[in-house]
Amino acid sequence: VVYKARDRVTNETIALKKIRLEQEDEGVPSTAIREISLLKEMQHRNIVRLQDVVHSEKRLYLVFEYLDLDLKKHMDSSPEFVKDPRQVKMFLYQMLCGIAYCHSHRVLHRDLKPQNLLIDRRTNCVKLADFGLARAFGIPVRTFTHEV
């Protein structure tokens, strides 16, 4: 669950992604560990910025920059958007820049969809978000068969 919040120190609007730690024996979910470890290494204008990680009793909060619009909401509320090839190309270019940056850092997002592409309304900047299913890739440890 993601909440809109205000940083008490900077007065900046932020997004808080709450992760429940209900099972004491299981610890932090692997999706949260992956998202944190990958995002703290990546800094790019087309990737959502992870600002902090806060641990409190039975909860983990990921603190992100706040962006209130995703591509799905944008397309639903602005049907003329898909008819404007210049704007579509601009958004697609930014998305590809973010993906290229991920790949250059050996990260596969694995959950690209309009809801995971956030838009900064002030700058029209598109940012990849939700790296919970993302994976780092490298040389495979074991060889896989070519047969299914």
UniProtKB/Swiss-Prot annotation:
The modification Phosphothreonine is found at T145. One of its GO terms (molecular function) is cyclin-dependent protein serine/threonine kinase activity. The active site is at D111. It catalyses: L-seryl-[protein] + ATP = O-phospho-L-seryl-[protein] + ADP + H(+); L-threonyl-[protein] + ATP = O-phospho-L-threonyl-[protein] + ADP + H(+); [DNA-directed RNA polymerase] + ATP = phospho-[DNA-directed RNA polymerase] + ADP + H(+). Keywords: ATP-binding, Cell cycle, Cell division, Kinase, Mitosis, Nucleotide-binding, Phosphoprotein, Serine/threonine-protein kinase, Transferase. Plays a key role in the control of the eukaryotic cell cycle. It is required in higher cells for entry into S-phase and mitosis. Component of the kinase complex that phosphorylates the repetitive C-terminus of RNA polymerase II. This is Cell division control protein 2 homolog 1.
